[in-house]
Amino acid sequence: MLSFQDMILTLQRFWIKHGCALMQPYDMEVGAGTFHESTFLRAIGPEPWRAIFVQASRRPSDGRYGENPNRLQRYYQMQVVIKPSAPDLQALYLQSLYAIGIDPATQDIRFVEDNWESPTLGAWGLGWEVWLNGMEISQFTYFQQVGGIECKPVTGELTYGLERIAMYLQNVNSVYDLIWTTTPDGVLTYGDVHQQNEREQSFYNFEYADIADLCAQFDAAEKMSLLLAQKKFPLPAYEQALKASHLFNLLDARRAISVTERQRYILRVRALSKAAAEAWYETRAALDFPLCRQQGIEK
C-alpha cells in the first residue's frame, strides 16, 4: 500500500520520465493549482512548457474545524501542464494511475464532460472530470483562454485530487487516517500533520479574520497589482492579484460581502488577472519568446 508521500513521488517520477520539469509549490495562498504561475502565466503565448508540481490550495469556506473527514480548507493538488497539449494525454494519465496501483482494466473509470471556468482568472477550457468508481479524482482541461487571452497553442492541464486518490488506495473513510509516511518513530498520519491546522485556520477564516483589515488589504493589493502591470512587471503584478484573490475568499468565508458585492469583487480580481496576463504576453514578446527561439519553434 502506497503512503501519501510515496504516491506523490511515484506520480512525479512518472511525469518526469515523460518529459515534465518538476516545479516547486508556489509560495502564495492560492485557491487551486491553476493559480500557480507554471499554469496561469505559462499557458499564455506560443512558448512550449511541460511541468509537474504539487500545490497546497486554500479554500477558506470549505473549512470544518478539522471535524469533517472529507472537507478541508487546505488540501493538495498535483498538476501536470503540457503545452502544446500532448495528443496522448489521456493515455498517459491512465498509465500514471496504473503506476500507483489503479488498474484501468479492472476499475470503473469514466470521463464525464465538464467544461471548466475560473471567473477570477478570466480563464476557461474544454474539460472532463475523471471518476473512479463513482468518485471524482481528477480534472482534464484544455485551456481555450487565460486572462482573457486566447490560448495559442492550447495547453493541456491535468489535476489530481491527491487526498481522494490516496483515500481510495488506502481504503480509509477519513482523510485524517491517511498514512502520510512511516518513519523510524512509527506511522505518521495526515491528521498528525494537518488536523490542528484545519481546526485553527477554520477559527481564523470564519470568526477572527478582521473584516475591515481584509478590505483595506484588498484595496492595497489591487492598487499595487494594477501599477505593476502598467509598469510591465507581470510577475509581481500577478502575485498581488493572487493576494487580492485570497483576501476576497476570506471575506467570503466571513460572510462579509453581499451577493451583489461578491460579483463586483470577482470582476475586480478578474481585471487584475487580465492586466497581469497582458503584461506577461507583452514582456515575453519583447524578449522574442525565448523558449520558442531556444527550441527552434516558429512563433
Curated annotation (Swiss-Prot):
The record ties this protein, via Pfam families, to: tRNA-synt_2e (PF02091)
This enzyme's EC code(s): 6.1.1.14
What keywords does the record list, in alphabetical order?
A: Aminoacyl-tRNA synthetase, ATP-binding, Cytoplasm, Ligase, Nucleotide-binding, Protein biosynthesis
Q: Offer a single GO CC term for the protein.
A: cytosol
GO molecular function term, any single one: ATP binding
Q: Does the keyword section mention Cytoplasm?
A: yes
Q: Which GO terms describe its biological process?
A: glycyl-tRNA aminoacylation
Q: Which NCBIfam families match?
A: glyQ, PRK09348.1
The UniProt entry's sequence similarity note says: Belongs to the class-II aminoacyl-tRNA synthetase family.
The record's PANTHER family line, in alphabetical order, gives:
GLYCINE--TRNA LIGASE, CHLOROPLASTIC_MITOCHONDRIAL 2 (PTHR30075:SF2), GLYCYL-TRNA SYNTHETASE (PTHR30075)
Q: Which HAMAP family match?
A: Gly_tRNA_synth_alpha
Give the protein's recorded name.
Glycine--tRNA ligase alpha subunit
Q: Which organism is this entry from? A: Dichelobacter nodosus (strain VCS1703A)
What gene, per UniProt, encodes this protein?
glyQ
